[in-house]
Structure formats: C-alpha cells, structure tokens
C-alpha cells in the first residue's frame, strides 16, 4: 500500500470491539467485574441479533452481540464455527464515502454497505492480512436520541456532552 498524507486519510477512530456471545446475560457479569457499565441493549434493525454496548473506563466501548432465538444469521453461523469470541473491530469514520474510496483505491475489499436512519456501515472483508473483520461506521446525530445517557455516547469522534 502507498503512503497517504493526512489530507488523503479520512478522520477515523476505534469505536468499539464486538464480541460474539451466545447470551449477553451470561457474559455480562465478567464485563461488570472488569468495571464496564452497560449503556444500551437493543435489537438490530434486521431482527437477527441483539447488541449491548458497555463503557469501559472513560471512553472505551465493548459490544456484546447475541443471536435472537429461532433466527439463523451470520451470528449463529459464526458461533457454530468459532464459538464465542472476538467478532469485529469497529472504526468510526467521519466520512463513509471517503473512507471506502481510500480503502478501495488501495485494493482493499469493502463489502455490505448499509445505510440506516441513525448510521451507515460497511465492512472490510476478513480476507485481509490481519484476518480481522473491520466494521466502518458513520453515525448520524439521531443515533443518540432515545438512548439512556446519550451524553456518554460519541458522534463524530466527540462526546455528545462536549
């Protein structure tokens, strides 16, 4: 890959690490022992899985994702093949189109772009030298609406209370 200057690289930060579990309720006690505080537990817009976000320390977030009973999905396939464990690393990007363009210009395969009301997401295929599934997310301001403690969420890389 070629070197890029700051002007070519879109603003980006680590948002959270996603961990696949069979049950959030079973996994949550360990996160609580580590000092994590649950911020959100809700169903994915597709209805195939649920996620719970946890704040760890001042700004680090961990996401647990669990399948919805009776639903076959990427998550049930992942758990059947791998068991519980790290599923993805999410990077918040300030400009999804620019981030995808920068990656694809270097031959990186970006897949499954989806635009929701509250965010856009895309994934870097795990068939890359790291073997990691990278999720790119661009949040919209409406992401925080209706969630408990929205001032503790980050949009555009900044805490909403700033």
Language-model region placement:
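Short, structured motif recognition centered on aromatic/hydrophobic residues
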Residues: 14-21, 30-31, 54, 59-65, ...
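Short, tandemly repeated low-complexity microdomains enriched for cysteine and small residues
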Residues: 41-44, 74-80, 115-117, 145-148
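A low-complexity, Ser/Thr/Gly/Pro-enriched, surface-exposed linker/loop concept
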Residues: 69-73
């Amino acid at each position: 890959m070629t070197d890029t200057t700051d002007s070519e690289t879109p603003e980006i930060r680590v948002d959270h690490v996603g961990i696949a579990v069979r049950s959030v309720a079973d996994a949550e006690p360990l996160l609580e022992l580590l000092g994590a505080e649950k911020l959100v537990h809700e169903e994915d817009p597709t209805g195939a899985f649920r996620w719970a976000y946890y704040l760890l320390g001042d700004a680090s977030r961990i996401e647990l994702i669990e399948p919805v009973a009776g639903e076959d999905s990427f998550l049930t396939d992942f758990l059947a093949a791998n068991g519980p464990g790290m599923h993805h690393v999410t990077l918040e990007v300030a400009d999804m189109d620019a981030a995808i363009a920068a990656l694809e210009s270097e031959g990186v395969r970006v897949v499954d772009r989806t635009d929701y009301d509250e965010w856009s997401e895309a994934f870097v295929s795990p068939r890359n030298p790291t073997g990691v599934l990278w999720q790119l997310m661009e949040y919209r301001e409406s992401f925080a609406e209706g969630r408990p403690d929205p001032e503790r969420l980050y949009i555009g890389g900044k805490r909403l209370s700033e």
